[in-house]
Amino acid sequence: MLILAVESSCDDTSVALVRMGERERKILSCRTASQTETHKLYGGVVPEIASRAHIEAISSLCYAAFDEAGCTPEQVELVGVTAYPGLIGSLFVGVNFAKSLAYAYGKPLVAVNHTHAHAAAAYLGHPDLRPPFLALTVSGGHTSLSDVRDYTEFEVVGRTRDDAAGEAFDKVARVMGIPYPGGAEIDKLASLGDPDAIHFPSAAIAGDTLDLSFSGLKTAVINYLNTASQRGDTVVRENVAAALTRSVTSSLVCRVGEAVQRTGRETVVLAGGVAANSHLRAELSEYCEKHGLRLCMAPRHLCGDNAAMVGTQAYYEYLAGNRADLTLAARATE
């Protein structure tokens, strides 16, 4: 099945054509326009600017995707689009673009959950991956643990109660003077630092829960930096990055371990923008190897927002009988 997919949930505009089947998961084209340089000026994503940039980019990306794939709109069999969750103005652009294409060419339309699409990115890197599995989705806007019983059956068993893990990285990076987005630079600095030099709290919430809270961890790091500045103390940025990274990764891996015990799953999927973090990939790999679990990580180039993952999940939504019509509306929340 040839699927046209659209992604515009935050600040990346993406259009892809994927071919999906019982034994086929293939990306024919995936064109993405990043707004990072624009939002870097403001230290974070400005929703109104993001939605306007989506409008400017989406049509040309669609043309480019068709050119690269060597096919025409008439050949498309399904249109999939991220409809929730995300920035409402950004989602609005992608949803209406997808609805217009579906209407103009008489194609079926499928709405896709953005966090489910991130997990689906792992299918593209692991052709034999099938549910059930435990999915850890970690990004700048979302952090959740889901028991994936089937391709479209997700049960969230743990999530952040406040900031997402990626948001904590970005906000600490900003205080450290690192331009947005700071996650990648924090990852590099952490490789050069000593995680034992500073103690920061865990993000795992105490009690009978798999939830996390990154707000307290973020505040603890920022307070450390501000106190050091007021005292005139020297701050070793590499050590701060290393200690922060260890707190984040160890908290996430701890929750994965607890979730595995509760669900009995033997396969773990790691996806989302923060899934590109080298320390998280290494620590989770070590844990899974030690405990005899299979780990399927989304390919690094598909960890960020992209339409290929949306098209992949759209295929399974379609097979499950999930359809949308022209009344489809974007939603900021799940």
Q: Model features per residue range: what roles?
A:
Residues T13-R19, A135-T137, T143-D147:
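Short beta-strand scaffold segments in enzyme catalytic cores
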Residues L2-P85, N96, H114:
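N-terminal beta-alpha supersecondary unit
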Residues A120, A298-E334:
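Glycine-rich phosphate-binding/hydrolytic loop that grips phosphoryl groups
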Residues A111-V112, V268, L284-M309:
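Conserved phosphate-binding/catalytic loops in two-lobed NTP-binding clefts
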Residues A111-L134, Q313:
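Conserved phosphate-binding catalytic cores of ATP/NTP-utilizing and phosphoryl-transfer enzymes
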Residues P127, D150-D194, K218-T219, N223-A228, ...:
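Glycine-rich phosphate-binding loop plus the immediately following alpha-helix
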Residues C30, K188-V268, N277-Y287, H291, ...:
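A contiguous, well-structured pocket-lining segment that forms one wall/lid of small-molecule binding clefts
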Residues V81-Y105, S278-Y287:
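Short Gly/Thr/Asp-enriched flexible loops that form oxyanion-binding sites at enzyme active sites
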